């Protein structure tokens, strides 16, 4: 699902497994030492969000939300990536919520504006897919009901 939006590339690019492993090792080394820096936690959360795995993306959102809740000084930098994580997880309501939060403070933020476009396009696309599935299901039910009705009239 590549995008033509230059600022939204972040939402659709991934880290290599080796790059993610470097961030993971740093984060867990600090856990073993008994003190995790906000920067290491942020870097690892960011890396997890840039993973192609929904499980890892979910973990990344969780780490960034922990920073968001515990450290008001780091909320701005977490807000965009939390929105990206929710977008990648197809949780568009939360993606929109966090992205709009950032846009309310920084209306000119090009990354957030591009992400907003991606979110809205995804909502429309998923809505059309949902309508298509419902229409197909109704058609099948109609065919079955018509067939049953036709047989009962014989």
Swiss-Prot record:
Gene3D superfamilies noted in UniProt:
Tetratricopeptide repeat domain
- Superkingdom, taxonomy of origin: Eukaryota
Ranges facing Cytoplasmic side = 1-127
Give the signal peptide as a residue range, or say none if absent. Answer: none
GO terms, molecular function: lipid binding; molecular adaptor activity
Disulfide partners: none
Alphabetical list of Pfam families matching this protein: Fis1_TPR_C (PF14853), Fis1_TPR_N (PF14852)
**Alphabetical UniProt keywords:** Membrane, Mitochondrion, Mitochondrion outer membrane, Repeat, TPR repeat, Transmembrane, Transmembrane helix
Mode of membrane association:
Single-pass membrane protein
| Name assigned to this protein | Mitochondrial fission 1 protein
Subcellular location, in the record's words? Mitochondrion outer membrane
Membership in a protein family: Belongs to the FIS1 family.
Q: Which residues lie on this side of the membrane: Mitochondrial intermembrane?
A: 149-154
- Gene of this entry: FIS1
Start-end of each TPR repeat: 76-109
Q: Which residues cross the membrane?
A: 128-148
What GO cellular component entries does it have? mitochondrial outer membrane; peroxisomal membrane
Function statement: Has a role in mitochondrial fission. Has a role in outer membrane fission but not matrix separation.
Q: What is known of its domains?
A: The C-terminus is required for mitochondrial localization, while the N-terminus is necessary for mitochondrial fission.
Tell me which Gene Ontology terms the entry assigns under biological process: mitochondrial fission; peroxisome fission
């Amino acid at each position: 699902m590549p995008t033509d939006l230059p600022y939204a590339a972040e939402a659709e690019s991934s880290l290599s497994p080796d790059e993610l492993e470097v961030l993971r090792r740093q984060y867990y080394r600090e856990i073993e030492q008994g003190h995790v820096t906000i920067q290491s936690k942020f870097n690892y959360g960011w890396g997890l969000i840039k993973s192609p795995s929904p499980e890892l993306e979910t973990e990344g959102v969780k780490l960034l939300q922990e920073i968001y809740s515990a450290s008001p000084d780091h909320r701005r930098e977490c807000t965009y990536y939390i929105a990206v994580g929710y977008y990648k997880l197809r949780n568009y309501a939360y993606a929109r919520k966090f992205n709009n939060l950032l846009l309310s403070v920084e209306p000119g933020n090009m990354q957030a504006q591009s992400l907003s476009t991606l979110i809205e396009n995804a909502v429309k696309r998923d809505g059309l897919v949902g309508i298509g599935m419902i229409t197909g299901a109704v058609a099948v039910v109609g065919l079955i009901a018509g067939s049953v009705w036709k047989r009962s009239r014989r």
